[in-house]
Amino acid sequence: MRTSLAYLLLSLSTLHAAISPDHIRRLQEEAAEALVIKAEQVDVKITEVKDGRRIDVQVTASVQSVIRSKAGHKPGDVVKVAYKVMDIKNPPPGPGEARLLSKGETIRAYLDHSSDKQSLRLAVYGHSFQKP
């Protein structure tokens, strides 16, 4: 009984919780860039990993409209967005992965600046892309 209880407590302590709608809204509001973008080019690199694959995505997109922009982006600007998607057989519970964008697709994107300053990164995990 004690062993079962200890195992249960250990299992519960390692669960990744999904993020709440309030937390998603807060992250969207705090994103440095809230832009409507059109994917002009989508480059994908797939790497096999244990239990699945890692998909590195580089998107070159044109800014269609600006909700807000700390960098001063304006319609017509070209931005680069870099992100990864883990496509694994048994994903842990959590915020979920972003979806792969398609060339020509227009979406509202919540983004932050990457540390290399060469591209933007997702600000809200799997909730960074929304219908415009």
Question: Where are the regions a protein language model picked out?
Answer:
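Sec-dependent N-terminal signal peptides
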Residues: 3-13
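Transition segments tied to proteolytic processing and entry into folded domains
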Residues: 11, 15-132
